[in-house]
Amino acid sequence: MSDKYIGDSHLEETGEEKQDSQEKEAVTPEKAEEQKLKAKYPNLGQKPGGSDFLMKRLQKGQKYFDSGDYNMAKAKMKNKQLPCAGPDKNLVTGDHIPTPQDLPQRKSSLVTSKLAGHVEDLHQV
């Protein structure tokens, strides 16, 4: 029985070796391509932050893509500076069901509707 176990383990090792060699062959073209690119662009991976010029520009402060970005940032700054008003106690927020007494009085319009004058004409027909 021990002979079979040794034989099986030997076969497993051989299978693993075959898989390892296949993985190495699959990675080899990628590594070769990577080496070609490194030879073509030697300074590519040295500084993760970029050039000194770029770092200096980033240190100066935020720059905007166009006037729209600038105006939006400016509006955000104004909104932060405004004092926050407390919640209005008379504001209906959906906590209760409004009744006709809770609703404000409706304002009468100064201009009468053209449709309202014709209602009388319809009743006469």
From Swiss-Prot:
Positions carrying Phosphothreonine: T28, T99
Gene Ontology biological process: cell division; G2/M transition of mitotic cell cycle; mitotic cell cycle
PTM-bearing positions, type Phosphoserine: S67, S109
UniProt-annotated location(s): Cytoplasm
Biased composition range(s): Basic and acidic residues: 1-37
GO molecular function, a single term: protein phosphatase regulator activity
Stretch list, region Disordered: 1-53, 81-108
PTM characteristics: Phosphorylation at Ser-67 by gwl during mitosis is essential for interaction with ppp2r2d (PR55-delta) and subsequent inactivation of PP2A.
One Gene Ontology cellular component: cytoplasm
Signal peptide positions (record): none
Keywords of this entry: Cell cycle, Cell division, Cytoplasm, Mitosis, Phosphoprotein, Protein phosphatase inhibitor
Record PANTHER family: ALPHA-ENDOSULFINE, ENDOSULFINE
Family: Belongs to the endosulfine family.
Purpose of the protein: Protein phosphatase inhibitor that specifically inhibits protein phosphatase 2A (PP2A) during mitosis. When phosphorylated at Ser-67 during mitosis, specifically interacts with ppp2r2d (PR55-delta) and inhibits its activity, leading to inactivation of PP2A, an essential condition to keep cyclin-B1-CDK1 activity high during M phase.
Name of this chain's protein: Alpha-endosulfine
Native source organism of the sequence: Xenopus tropicalis (Western clawed frog)
Name of the gene encoding the protein in the UniProt record: ensa
